[in-house]
């Protein structure tokens, strides 16, 4: 049976009652408005109350209405799965459906319960219904084509318009499921949209009550792709990489917002300091193994060196952090220097105490006993630093007094001043055979005043068989007259101590060389005055002519200064142009060499 035909039958039956009155004194019916016509002046299509009361004797019209209601109920049962109001049984007379359009005009139903059943059975053509009590009557009805806003405005209940629409939609789907019928695809599309987008306008009637984005429990911050990186990099599309666990971004975009000027972990000093003790401990462990193979011996030595260096670094850091330890170190250094000065003064006093001895006993050096074998271990031989010129002025004066005093008077033999002499070419030529002779030979340097001189150009006087003694020169005297060379090194075990306390007697007589001021053997006071005056020659710019014109003793007229920087290696020698005061013999001995030196200075 066609649904439209059934509705038409119901309308015809209701309208064919001859304007039947409603039995039992109750008003039920309402005339249906005729839609699709725009005649506003047509008054017969409007709602109006029934004009006549039902007459009790008109039984034939009531029987016809009951028959029509039975036919409509059969039609409704057939179309029940497709009607929203089919869940309402005909016996529940309190539900009146806003229904369908029809060409029939208004009607008045009669016969009480039959008309109510027919009207209830005819419901379901409209997806919106209202539950009203049975005593109510005279409700106006609108068709499907009427405005939805008007219908929603008349809703009075606990639901909002959007919730009511959603409820009707779910109830319709339930009817299809209850009738074992396939649910149309058009009913499922809005539900799918609601799962993906909470702002789907297809099933929002009115959002005036503010339900908005909270529909169905979805909020605007919900991520449609939870496992994907949310970084867009200022573009339209999101990053295609998967996000890190419990993070919003991938590994590439995790550190994108950090500052660029942060240093790397490898460059920080804290990590290097932490790694240093571990490396030192590993090296020390490898070095302290008792049975280390020979292949790993180099690693053990390196480990010991690293451990020693680390210990020095720790000590330096502790000393730097503790100012008291720094002060203590300075005190120790000062005490050490003072002890060296005391030892030097002691050695000088010993030299002064034996100054009455014969010079021959003081210098028992022969051709075989070369003093350079004893004291040539210092690599700075023949060189004088500026601080050595200024150091120990009193000791230099005492040394001069020693050599210019009675020792010079007692020495009768005179030795002419000749070229410089060289030390033995090989260690075997010396009488003192030291265990480390080769090492000493490697540390020697040639005799030089201001320019290097070849050893072949030196004098052959040391190798000459005529001379029994070594020729004395200022460079030799400045080197060999140490406490060891003066006979105090009887025990060879004391050589190292003597070298540590070495204070050369004439270390200040190197730069000037022999200047040619010769003294007589019996004029000791004049020699001292000559020394005090010749000390000022250093301030005269090493001018040889101006220094010797003003000789305090008046024994020298003019002394020529030898070629010191000659490349031929010839030693500066004295021109025998000096005139002596009461002596005819020229003495080029020890005294004439020692006292004439402009580099000694009194403070």
Swiss-Prot record:
Q: Which InterPro entries match?
A: Gln-Leu-Gln_QLQ, GRF, WRC_dom
As annotated in the record, motif Bipartite nuclear localization signal runs over 228-238, 256-263
Gene Ontology biological process terms in this record: developmental process; DNA-templated transcription; regulation of DNA-templated transcription
Keyword Nucleus part of the UniProt annotation: yes
In which domain of life is the source organism classified? Eukaryota
Keywords noted in UniProt: Activator, Nucleus, Transcription, Transcription regulation
Q: Does the keyword Transcription regulation apply?
A: yes
Cite the residue spans of the region called Disordered: 34-58, 561-582
Compartmental location: Nucleus
Q: Where is the QLQ domain?
A: 158-193
> Could you give one GO CC term from the UniProt record?
nucleus
Its job = Transcription activator that plays a regulatory role in gibberellin-induced stem elongation.
- Entry's PANTHER family? GROWTH-REGULATING FACTOR 2, GROWTH-REGULATING FACTOR 5
Q: What is known of its domains?
A: The QLQ domain and WRC domain may be involved in protein-protein interaction and DNA-binding, respectively.
Q: What is this protein called?
A: Growth-regulating factor 6
**Native source species:** Oryza sativa subsp. japonica (Rice)
The gene name reads GRF6
